[in-house]
Every structure is written in structure tokens, then in C-alpha cells.
Amino acid sequence: MEKYIKEHTLKPNEIERYGRQLITPDIGVSGQMSLCNSSVLIIGAGGLGCPVALYLSSAGIGTLGLVDYDTVEISNLHRQIGHRESSKGISKAVSLSKTISELNSLIKVNTYETTFTSETAMEIIKNYDIVVDASDNVATRYLVNDACVLTGKPLVSGSALKWEGQITCYNYNNGPCYRCIFPTPPPVETVTKCSDGGVLGPIVGVIGSLQALEVIKILTNNKEGVLSGRLLIYDGMSAVFRTVRIRGKQSGCNVCGDKPTVTQLIDYTQFCQSNYSESAGK
Amino acid sequence: MEKYIKEHTLKPNEIERYGRQLITPDIGVSGQMSLCNSSVLIIGAGGLGCPVALYLSSAGIGTLGLVDYDTVEISNLHRQIGHRESSKGISKAVSLSKTISELNSLIKVNTYETTFTSETAMEIIKNYDIVVDASDNVATRYLVNDACVLTGKPLVSGSALKWEGQITCYNYNNGPCYRCIFPTPPPVETVTKCSDGGVLGPIVGVIGSLQALEVIKILTNNKEGVLSGRLLIYDGMSAVFRTVRIRGKQSGCNVCGDKPTVTQLIDYTQFCQSNYSESAGK
Amino acid sequence: MKVKIELSGGLELLFDKKKVHEIEFSDKNEIPLKDLILYMRDNLLKERSELFVVDDTVRPGILVLINDADWELFGGISYNVEDKDTIIFISTLHGG
Amino acid sequence: MKVKIELSGGLELLFDKKKVHEIEFSDKNEIPLKDLILYMRDNLLKERSELFVVDDTVRPGILVLINDADWELFGGISYNVEDKDTIIFISTLHGG
Ligand SMILES: [Zn+2]
Ligand SMILES: [Zn+2]
């Protein structure tokens, strides 16, 4: 249902820019106002982070935070469409911030040229309404999950490798968190990195776009449609998607359960036996 | 299966740039060489055309053609992530060409600041291996289909509106064409335009990324996976995709059948009772 | 017999904005697809029926799926709908 | 009984790169999921079994689906696989 409200705070240049978005059913003027008044933190400005940031900035999310310690390399550009050749060697967070500012100067962008760690996470995350996990390694995924649970933020989590991708939302509307589904980190030798296995640009394009849409659904309060308690699995080679039902919030979960054992951030590199950075592991 | 070949024509800067793509299974060095030696024509530099062009240029398609008569408006920017505010008023084909050249200077881009019509289509299309339909109206869709059938080019067709999208490949590997599935144009009053119904950026992001991947599969000869004879239907609100089986090539089809009645391009604005441009219909 | 009907591509707007309809015909074991379409027109769709049915079949631009496959693979309008079939009506999109 | 097994997220690489395996147990009507997993380890997977099975269950990081739903909703490893069930093993991805 389209929601029209008489008193709104959108400026004429916002009406002009977002017109075809706010006439979309279930967005409406009130939905657009929610987007403009919200803040989203994106962990990772790489293959997934680029489409997420491009679509969220163009949609008019009021404040975007971009966290990435890496710098742009030419070998990133086959899939990281938010960077430019001229950004080679500079921070990915800054490079992506520059691109999205040229696309939409109405929004605010904060860049964090730092590794997201147990030391930096809480100070950064507290300023945002929603977190997007667009990272590339196991340790960061557990860290982001726990930080979201401890601060009560919904987490839109996407991942990709080769021809495949996966996406779901954690810690949303009393749904499960990452640890509810994966209480124990995978053995190190079973984890394939994009730098080893390869990954195609359109795969991260699909998953990143899907992550941006989940953020929009959460912020416009389209609760029923949110991918919570459901996991979307994508096989690009066969062009088949599968939406499967996963377990709900687990009362025995170590971080979001009834008697959590994790009540503050831990050392995730130790927990996962791996680094916070894909490249650091090489 | 990864294909390694000893004699290849990739230059060192191509190996550097496409390394993580060419190590992906079923791409390989030979697949990358195919991409670098291919040409793709994209009809429409709007919501779908932007992600298609960004991902195909970054993947290293040798030559991209961009056809669009429109100019960039601020109201496009909520979903057309390949343009910039500073491109306001200039040709969409030129604006998008500028963005992708900054992303990958190794590829060649041709811009056609013209409406794709029965008069211009054949001269443009003959220079390309594959065509992507990223247009926004019925008349252009029939025109592009017939031009592809008459010139024997595979067609990767995507469309989107509001929270939904659809994608399939036509005229590929003896599969059906658009007219096989839709022999008669829809009544004008049943066609909703994006300018009336709205559309969300991530929806065109998903469909455009999927179109780029189909192009890559066709060019790298991953025949089995190509969405031919199958239609992918996407409902973004419920986060559900459905891949359905559609009819094969129809012997009675007016353009690709055994006794075609359409042997050269016709007047599609008359056939469809509508214009080649969404905005012209306003 | 029970039939599940799904609508997409905007067609649901003609049917009370509901994307899924479950219909039960307690007196039948099967029903010609043509009769089901006319039933939908006369009972589920209240106005502007020409946006759904033209000449006693679905209008051009609507793709009909029988259990996730194109109805042309099953004889099109002459198919007999059986118990527990899912019939999907998709309006093709043209935007971009 | 017949069981359909699907592998994704790279797990298919351990199983001859085949994403779909159909297994028939002509002498059984049902089989404990644990036995099926050990059967897969011993018969379909030839080397590096520790990448699939640890402590007689799937290793951490693999999600098991029974007919498109999380196995935890059906009792996990203690589920009894029935005729025509589809069991999916998904290795979770971490890249981006
Ligand atoms: Zn939990
Ligand atoms: Zn045809």
C-alpha cells in the first residue's frame, strides 16, 4: 500500500531526485523520509561493498559509513565497480566515498580507513541504525555479528565466491544471529578465499544489490518481506536461486541466547584461527 | 573445468587486471581471451544498462556499444548508478561511456546518441556479437528481437518495474525468440512504465547484474547454464526468485519460424501502438 | 479439488492486490483451464476484465505457467486443471 | 528408497565436481541421516574426508537442508531420511 502523508520534511530537490522511488508501492513519502533519516554502516568496500554503497547512496540513505583498511589495486577492478583506475593505491573507503558523492551529493559519507576489530568496532557501530556485512573473511563475520547483537543492530549479511552467493539478515525482529546458525567457526583449511578461488563481478553485483534491497525493506518497515530466518542461495552458473528456511533464534546461542557467554567482543582472529583481512592471510 | 592454454594473447596488464576472474572455474585463460575479443551492444543506458555496462566493462569485454537517445536527469540517479550529477543534461550514452572508461581504459566503447529504430538498428547491430536489451518500452523490445533474429545474434533480455524483474536469453542455441513467447504485443493500456509505477535501484541492479552474467556465460561457451528456454522471475519484496521452463522455438513464429512473415524490420511503433521511448509517451 | 493461483508482474493489482489465491471446487475433480480463467474473471476480478481476458483467453502479454512450466508445453488454454495444480499468471514487464 | 543429494558452496569439489547425486537403497525404507552422511563419506568421497565429516557429523560451516529447510527444524543429525527426500549440503561462503 502506498502511504501518502501531508506533512513531510522532504525538500524539493529530494522530491525531484527520489520521485520515481517514492511512488513505488510500499515505499511512499514516509518510506523515503525514513531512508533520508537513516544511517547504514557498510563493512568492506570491495566486491559486495561497491554495489551496496552505490545503491544505498543513490536511494538517499542519509548517512553511510564505509569501513575498509585496504587500498585499491588494479586486480580489484574486474568486480569492484565503485572504484576507478585513478584511485589505485588510495584507500578503498575514500575511493568509494568519492564515487558515491559524485552520484548523490545530498547524503553524508563517513570513511573509516581502519580494520574493523574488537577494539574499533563498538565505537564505529554505535552511530548507525543498520550494519551491512560485505567483508571477505570468517573472523570479521563473527566480529560483525557479535557487535550487532551486543548493540542491537540488524545485520544484512552477504557473501560470494566463484559463481555462487548467499544472503540473509541476522539479528532482525527477534530472528537468528550468525552464531545461531554457525556456532563453531569452520576449520581454516575449508575456507576458500576469493583470491584463491576467484569470483565474478556480476555475482557480487547480484548479492550486493540484494543486500541493498534488504536494507531498504528494513528501513521502510516492510517486515514481512525481509530475509530473516530465510537464506537465499544463488548459483550463477545454473541461474538458479533457492530461498530456504533456516532455524530461528536459538535460546542456547552463545551471544544472543538466554545465557550468553559472549557479553563483550572477544579476539576473533584467535576464535577463528585466521586474520581480519583476506589479503593478510596470503 | 578450468581451461589452461599455453599460448595466449593476454598482455601482462590484462593478466594483472583479470587475474581473479580468469582463475574462476569455467572461465580460465581461454574464457578471458574470448571476453577480450568480443563485442556487446547494450540497448539503453538507464537503470538496467548501467549495471550491465559497468560489469561487462570491468570484466574486459573488448568492445561495448551503448545506444541511448536520452540525457541524464537528476530523477534518474536514484537507480542509474553509472551516471553522475555532473552529467546532468548530457547524453546518457556518453555519460555512461565516461564512467566505464575510468573503470577500465583497456576496452573500447562506442556511443550511439540515437534512438534505436528500424532505420538505425541494422547498421549498428552488425558490428556486435551479442545484444543486451536494457530498454524501457514494448516497441523497442520487438524491434531488438527482430533485429537479433534477422542478424543471428543472441539477445539477453531483462526488464524491471516496481519491486519485480524478469530475465531470459532469446535466439540462443536454437532456443525461442521474444515473438515465440509473445507473438502479439500487449494492449497499450496494460503496459505500466517505470515513470508511472516507480522502480527501485536494487531491482535493476539485480537484473542488470544477471544480464551481464548471461553475456559472460554465452561468450565463454558455458552453454548449459545459459537462461535459454527458461525465464527467471524475481519478486524483490518477498525475496523469491523462480526459474520457469518456457516453450522452445516455435515453428510458426512470424520472425524465427519456418515460414517467417517478418523478413525485414517493420514499423514497431505502429505494430505496438506506442513509442520507442518511455519518455516520449508521457 | 483445490487449485493454487499466483499472480505477478502487476496482475495482482486486478485481484485485490493478493498475489496468491486458493480456490476449491468441491464438486469437481478437474476443470478446463479456460473455465478457470473465466471463473477468475467473473468471481475474483471485479472491474476492467479486459486487462486480464480478451476473446475468452488471457490477453497478449500474459504468460501462463502450469506448475512452473509454460502452458504451451501442456496444450495451452485446452489444458485440464487437476487437483493441487498451481497456475501462475505473469504479466511481462517492459521497463528498465 | 531413493534420496537426492545436492552439494553447493564448493562442497561439490569433494564429490567428483557433481552437484547432484541420486542414491538408491533398494533394501531400505528409511535411513538415519547420520548413516547417510557416513555412507557419503565412505562411498562418494574418496579423499580428505575431514573437509566434510568431523566427529561423525558434518564439519562446522556446512548447513544441511532437508527438503529446503534447515535440518535443525527436523532434529538435525538424528533425522530419519525417507524415500524421495532431498538433502542439501551447503558450505557457507565468506568471500566478498
Ligand atoms: Zn544467536
Ligand atoms: Zn521466434
Swiss-Prot record, chains C, D:
Superkingdom field: Eukaryota
Keyword tRNA processing tagged: yes
A Gene Ontology biological process term: tRNA thio-modification
GO CC list: cytosol; nucleus
Locations listed in the record: Cytoplasm
GO MF annotation: an example: protein tag activity
Pathway as given in its UniProt record: tRNA modification; 5-methoxycarbonylmethyl-2-thiouridine-tRNA biosynthesis
Family: Belongs to the URM1 family.
HAMAP family, A to Z: Urm1
Protein name: Ubiquitin-related modifier 1 homolog
Organism of derivation: Dictyostelium discoideum
Lineage, highest ranks first: Eukaryota, Amoebozoa, Evosea, Eumycetozoa, Dictyostelia
